[in-house]
Amino acid sequence: GKSGNPFPWESGEVKSDKGCFYANFKPDRGNYTMDGSLITSKCGIFSANSNGLYDMAGNVAEWTSTVYVESGVESMSDMNPDLKYNAAKEDPYRLKRKSVRGGSWKDPESLIRSAWRGYEYQNQPRSYVGFRCVRTMISDTRGTSGRGKKK
């Protein structure tokens, strides 16, 4: 989120002052339907954030292509680490873990932050893990992201 906010919307709260939830997650112990969905919800049900983006938290946790290591990103020197390893069938099971980010419909609000990191085993389908299409912004030589016009 912006300015140290743990969530991708303006407030540090998970629901508005009118009681409307900002994302699909488990708001109460054992209560999966309080936010209006039993499991995953349709895209766009919750309000967009200040950038006009929908569903940036909750609903499903996100698969990443990054290998899960216990030490986390602290052991990597890059600001946007991408540690790859395509485990073979005969590799030990611990080498088949991929990092999962954010939380899902089955998780409490503390886990729907994109900073939350866990793992699942590759090639193991889960109803609470999905993916987002992302790409790296390519900068020109002046350090802009190509959004503005060049003079």
Where are these regions (language model features)?
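Functional-site microenvironments in short loops/helix caps that host divalent-cation chemistry
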Residues: 1-118, 125, 142-150
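Short, structured beta-strand segments at or near domain termini in extracellular proteins/domains
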Residues: 127-143
